[in-house]
Amino acid sequence: VTAGGVPVVDHGTLALGRRLGQGGQGTVYEVTNKRVTPPQGGGWDAVYKEYTPPVLAQLDVAALETLVGLPGGSTAAQGQWLCERTAWPAAVVRRQGVTCGFLMRAVPERFMFDLRGLGNTVVGRHLANMEYLLNDDAYVAGIGLVVSDRDRFQLLADLAETLDRFHAMGVTVGDLSPKNLLFTTAPRPACFFIDCDAVRLRGATALPQAETPDWEVPAGERKATPASDAYKLALLAVRLLGRHQTSTDPAALASYSPELGRLARAGLGHDPAARPEPGQWTAPLKAASRKASTRPAQGNARPGRPRTGAPPGGAGTGTPPPRRTQGVGVAVAVALGLAALLVLEAQDDDTASAPGASAG
């Protein structure tokens, strides 16, 4: 069913499976009888995010509907790209005519990894949040991640290109942080955005803008603008190459490439108009990647303690440092599901398909 070209699903038609996660904004459930399909075909299993009553009281329903309608209102190629690379809301869900949440796709398997703990044992499958990479190489290798310097530069280049395309579409991320970014290194380094119901689209935002601690723009600056995204891209570049979660010192980045050091210093400046746009980072990052080591980070069999923000349970859990506030969504809670798409296809209730399977 569509309303004004926006896919709408009645809550009563959803066959909900297990609860996948719960966060400050709501709860995410497996959906066993729906599929989400992007503009150019293919499809993924669906999950459902139900907002809490306090969040619903702040929700701009029209802005959420505009987000859902963006892939279909773009060119087929552009909509497909958005659906494949981001957690874009796929359909509005209503209960008795009132919006209560939205559908989204399952996280691609390649953006998850086998988390290892004490004794090099596999703890389970976890989202590959970029936050894990803001620690020293011994910790990264110890929890089971295989990442080289070249991978880090290529991840940043992919992120810069993605932000550049976002901005051309009128999308600003706002709460751009490693908690809201997933990554993979195979078949090539790439990022995947989650918590996309929190972005700003053409000036409108479905939810009040919030920021992850230590990833805030300078005081007094408007949130979720191209300039704020540029600031946080510079922060991430500094911290990803510096293996640090709170640093603002571009020295480590500059040691790889003086040009990248200059971009970082300009990007962290307090004059929003003087910050380099994401597209200006792409070529220098790719150039640095060609010179960077391809040797994966090495570590001990037991994961070490993260340099900052270690989890309360101590090292060895492999858990990224916890968010100190409620945050912008159910980023980690969304463990298995995110959004992207347009057309919803019903399946037989007893035939839930595997993640990544094509629609049929």
Segments the model singles out, each with a brief description of its role:
Residues 293-340:
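Regulatory extensions appended to serine/threonine kinase catalytic cores
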Residues 25-92, 98-101, 106-144:
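ATP-binding glycine-rich loop module of kinase domains
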Residues 269-294:
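Terminal C-lobe "cap" of eukaryotic-type protein kinase domains
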Residues 339-358:
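C-terminal region of N-terminal signal peptides and the immediate post-cleavage residues
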Residues 9-19:
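Conserved N-terminal boundary motif of the eukaryotic protein kinase catalytic domain
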Residues 154-156, 163, 167-185:
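Catalytic-loop of the protein kinase fold
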Residues 191-192, 196-266:
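C-lobe/activation-segment region of protein kinase-like
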Residues 180-196:
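Conserved protein kinase catalytic/activation segment
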